[in-house]
């Protein structure tokens, strides 16, 4: 499984597909 650098989940949060998430303004 490859981790993506950033996926915008909306609601001010981004993450990858490896279980990590963080607050963000956009990707």
UniProtKB/Swiss-Prot annotation:
Cellular-component GO terms for this entry: extracellular region
GO molecular function, one term: toxin activity
Glycosylated sites: 2
Localization of this protein: Secreted
Post-translational modifications reported in the UniProt record: O-glycosylated with 3-O-methyl-O-alpha-D-mannopyranosyl.
Function: Toxin, essential for pathogenicity. Causes symptoms of Corynespora leaf fall disease (CLF) in rubber trees, including chlorosis, development of brown spots and necrosis. Alters leaf cell ultrastructure, causing plasmolysis in most cell types. In extreme cases the plasmolysis leads to disruption of the plasma membrane. Also affects chloroplast structure, causing lamellae distortion and reduced thylakoids stacking together. Causes accumulation of starch grains. Does not affect the nucleus or mitochondria.
Protein name per its UniProtKB record: Cassiicolin
Organism annotation: Corynespora cassiicola (Target leaf spot disease fungus)
């Amino acid at each position: 499984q490859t981790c993506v650098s950033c996926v915008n989940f909306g609601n001010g949060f981004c993450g990858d597909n490896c279980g990590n998430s963080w607050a963000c303004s956009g990707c």
